[in-house]
């Protein structure tokens, strides 16, 4: 239904689908992976009852900034995407969208996101500049370092401290445990994603943790996921979360175990499915948090 609604826009404007593909709103997995951890922080900051204003700002902000991130990523990769099987038909490569149009769209999306942040407070506004810097520089990191996934993790986690300052005006030390947990988790699942393109990346000299880790990739991913769960357990203790939260963590651990097993042959499709599967881990943790506060 969601995809059909988006495709119906193409009948209104012949170029609409090109921009939908550029922003990847036709592929909501990235929205989910950014949304769930942001909502972890929103719910914990609000002690189970966050303000509707905060929820609205961060849900819409996730949608806008994920779209902006996809646009700037494709702009940064416009000279290499044509050499990668998975990305060779993207709008900037096919010429359906120009570089100037992509940059203009990026500016509009960032501007709309900043308007949302203006409805919070000074601390959150200042923090938003850090998030923008991370989102803008991430796509270029794969040219210079084998750790672009770490920069992505930092960017994807930046909404968490912002959620605390927006909801409470304060940033407790334990909030950084959530930040570190999500950073570790993001590096793990995005390494699965990078494993899909590893053969192409090796040919064209693109760097990633998948290239760096080599045959140790799956073990390192599982270790990162385990460390993320450990940080979440520590955060749960600091925020006095109860049994439902830990059941959510157990469900997430089950997701991670399935991903490890299913990628044992390192087939492209299996690695991509493992990446997609992380959405369920994030959702399980969020539902655990919501349930924990609901039963009090």
From Swiss-Prot:
Reactions catalysed, as given in the entry: all-trans-octaprenyl diphosphate + 4-hydroxybenzoate = 4-hydroxy-3-(all-trans-octaprenyl)benzoate + diphosphate
The keyword Nucleotide-binding belongs to this UniProt entry's keyword annotation: no
The keyword Cell division belongs to this UniProt entry's keyword annotation: no
Cofactor(s) of this protein: Mg(2+)
Spans traversing the lipid bilayer: 28-48, 52-72, 102-122, 146-166, 169-189, 219-239, 241-261, 275-295
Pfam families: UbiA (PF01040)
Topological type in the membrane: Multi-pass membrane protein
CC terms in the record's Gene Ontology section: plasma membrane
Documented EC number(s): 2.5.1.39
BP term (GO), one: ubiquinone biosynthetic process
GO MF terms, alphabetically ordered: 4-hydroxybenzoate polyprenyltransferase activity
Record localization: Cell inner membrane
Keywords: Cell inner membrane, Cell membrane, Magnesium, Membrane, Transferase, Transmembrane, Transmembrane helix, Ubiquinone biosynthesis
Pathway given in the UniProt record: Cofactor biosynthesis; ubiquinone biosynthesis
InterPro entries for this protein: HB_polyprenyltransferase-like, Prenyltransferase, UbiA_prenyltransferase, UbiA_sf
Purpose: Catalyzes the prenylation of para-hydroxybenzoate (PHB) with an all-trans polyprenyl group. Mediates the second step in the final reaction sequence of ubiquinone-8 (UQ-8) biosynthesis, which is the condensation of the polyisoprenoid side chain with PHB, generating the first membrane-bound Q intermediate 3-octaprenyl-4-hydroxybenzoate.
Entry similarity comment: Belongs to the UbiA prenyltransferase family.
Name of this protein: 4-hydroxybenzoate octaprenyltransferase
Taxonomic lineage from the root: Bacteria, Pseudomonadati, Pseudomonadota, Gammaproteobacteria, Pseudomonadales
